[in-house]
Amino acid sequence: MGILGDGVAVVQNLVPTGLITAASKLAEAPLGLAEVATRLVEALAINSITEKARRGRRVIVKRRNLHSEQLADLTNLYFHMAEIPIRFWSKVEEWQRWEVGCFEMLNGDRYRAYASGTRCVIAEKLPGESLWEHLNRGTLTRRMLQAAAAEFRRAHQFWSDHFQGRWSHGDGSSQNVIYDSSNNRARLIDFEIVHEKSLATSARQADDLLVFLLDMVGTVPNRQWLPFSTTFLEAYGDREVIAKLRKQLDLPGGLAWIWWGVRTNFTNPAKVKQRLANLSRAIAKLKSYKEAGSALARNKRRPSISCQTIKPGIPTASSRARAIKESAVAGPSRMLRSLPTKT
């Protein structure tokens, strides 16, 4: 049974009345619901997040709130109706596996995460601050953007059995990029949202870049917009993904614009449109966009030790073991190309 129509009764006692009204109206009048749908998106508090000390180390505790599955399903309904190809992990167990697996894949060289009980994920706190904090303080620099781009590029090299392709974040906002100035290193966090499997790899990864850029589009001064955005893309450097990003810079209409409004902090649409148009022209002049060099390499599989799914979101080491076995048969030259690198 769906959430709309008779399905409203399923969540009627679990979420605020205003959200039920919003869900019903989304089906009845999908045009002109900016205010209602915005409240729908913003009101869904799926997690509570606290910082604690455990065994002398600071950790971040993410706890799924009561009725979070129903709230996530309601948000996913909006994404589906607006044709936005992302979704929340609504099942708590699947979210825990994915959150822990992705954190360990990207940050497990120095930091740990684990599921705790039936509703929590605990992760060691990463050093540094989010780039969103730097954006709002006006302390964002090109050096930080280059570090963020390098981390996105590194993360996008990992193989995911869930996608049967290279990994993508799903919510690549600046809030989810932690920058440590002591070693000029950026790291990714927060894996609540996942792209739809139907998206091509380059489209998923381009969406990660787009979400990051949309944070800046309404925040940085006009004189910094193009220098900052092109610095980020040049440092990322993957021609195929950047070409796909350029095709995603047109403003959407209907319900999808509401999500863009959230992403851009409800910046004036005319301002967003102008800045993205300027970026599109600038991309055409980028060296990394003009020169083909990475497309062939991106088609080669580089297995990782995490985010390999035998059920939705379950990491396993089978991909790495399989690749090592195949490489041994193929000879040393193939082994050097196949094994993933870690930083």
Give the ranges of each region predicted by the language model.
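Juxta-kinase regulatory segment immediately upstream of eukaryotic protein kinase catalytic domains
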Residues: 2-41
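ATP-binding glycine-rich loop module of kinase domains
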Residues: 47-94
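Activation segment
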Residues: 66-67, 128, 180, 186, ...
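Conserved kinase catalytic-core helix
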Residues: 97-110, 132-170, 175, 180
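Low-acidity, Ser/Thr- and Arg-rich intrinsically disordered low-complexity segments
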Residues: 294, 298-327, 332-343
